[in-house]
Amino acid sequence: MMKFAFKIAYFGDNFHGSQFQPDQRTVEGEVINALRRLGVENPRLRSAGRTDAGVHAYGQVISFYSEDKIFPRMLNAELPEDITAWAWAKVSEDFDPRRAKSRVYTYVMYGSDYDISAMRKAVKELIGVHDFSNFTKKFGEGESCVREIISADIRADREFIIFEIEGNAFTWNMVRCIVTAIMEIGKQHRSIEWFRDLLNPEKHKERVEPAPPYGLILKDVKYDDVEFEIDDYAFKTLQSRIEDRIIYHGTIFKLFSLFRQSGIS
């Protein structure tokens, strides 16, 4: 029996999250079904992390067991088009995708009327070790929400604001809640001092609601001791599927922009 790790990408629109649920369409559910069609009856699938309904991924990592060698292109032949495996590694028995060195998320916000300078100041406050209790849905009573943020950056890109954050781990909804707070500062509804207070939940308790899921992507999951090999054919498949999405959504974006200009919408 061999153990493999795959990098997978998925478009989250039509999934009830990544974690397996018996009566819902999920990423893990589709992967398990695909592996079974390849003859892997008990894959013991694990993922690096859970993404909520509507959240996308480019570099999610899964692990599974198989008696036969399986390549990403083989799995893709059994997967729906909104999930694509594109890199792989044979890993040791003790490899656990959850024990990653870090995870990288990107969130895209629409709009150009934000105070980007104020948002940058807020983002800098995230670096280091903090208690993110105000930015999370609690997993359970007494569970720690202390996490280390390695890097965080925000920039304007035409009509969009791009926020990228890397940390050792993230709590439930943490990135989306941070985005909500940063947007409040960008709209000048809140101050940097308020943001600093949110990072000190012992003195200031205030639940921040998460931003919409559709702007969030799990960009990468990093490990010290795993070298992934890209499956060229599978990667080209992924690039083609991304290009199809860009064409479709870019066309819809332009279409409704014209509606707005003409007063139809």
Swiss-Prot record:
Formation of pseudouridine at positions 38, 39 and 40 in the anticodon stem and loop of transfer RNAs. The gene is truA. GO terms for molecular function: RNA binding; tRNA pseudouridine(38-40) synthase activity. Its EC number is 5.4.99.12. CDD domains: PseudoU_synth_TruA_Archea (cd02866). It comes from the Archaea. It comes from Archaeoglobus fulgidus (strain ATCC 49558 / DSM 4304 / JCM 9628 / NBRC 100126 / VC-16). This is tRNA pseudouridine synthase A. Keywords: Isomerase, tRNA processing. Substrate binds at residue 105. The active site is at 52 (nucleophile).
